[in-house]
Amino acid sequence: MAKPTVNVNQAIRAREIRVVGANSEQLGIMPLNEALALAESQQLDLVEVSPTAVPPVCRIMDYGKFKYQQSKKLQEAKKKQSHVVVKEVKLRPKTDEHDLQFKIKHVRRFIEEGNKAKVTLVFRGREITHMEFGVRALERVASEIEDIAVIEMKPKMEGRSMFMIVAPKVKK
């Protein structure tokens, strides 16, 4: 992602600019060299805030402090983003009842934590000839967790395994 470049002091190309003071007061439209002299007299920088406006808007401020605040804002935004993790639970078509309940409990925990869950059913040997056992097992898992989850991807075959992806229900 390219960082937006901000024109500062001599890098500003417009002849006339609208100037905003250090304390957010409007100083009006003035020639660039006059605005640069004003900023220099206050020992601050002239920063182009809105280059697309007519005339461009520039603000008298401490550019180093401005960059620091921008980086802090970016870090805060990154902190607030939620990262979705897909957890996986593997089953077999002949998985015993107690073991299946145990795996379903794992899927429930993943969903309650806010993560997605991938339920994979692995066929071995000749088990693949009886796919209905696998479909039944995945449907059982889906029916057990339908109160807290929604099926994002229906059961689908991929090689010797069948999988489905479930996600937490969106709270209204």
Swiss-Prot record:
Belongs to the IF-3 family. SUPFAM superfamilies: Translation initiation factor IF3, C-terminal domain, Translation initiation factor IF3, N-terminal domain. GO terms for biological process: ribosome disassembly. GO terms for molecular function: ribosome binding; translation initiation factor activity. IF-3 binds to the 30S ribosomal subunit and shifts the equilibrium between 70S ribosomes and their 50S and 30S subunits in favor of the free subunits, thus enhancing the availability of 30S subunits on which protein synthesis initiation begins. PROSITE patterns: IF3. It holds the Pfam family IF3_N. The gene is infC. One of its GO terms (cellular component) is membrane. HAMAP family: IF_3. It is found in: Cytoplasm. It comes from Geobacter metallireducens (strain ATCC 53774 / DSM 7210 / GS-15). This is Translation initiation factor IF-3. Disulfide bonds: none annotated. Monomer. Keywords: Cytoplasm, Initiation factor, Protein biosynthesis.
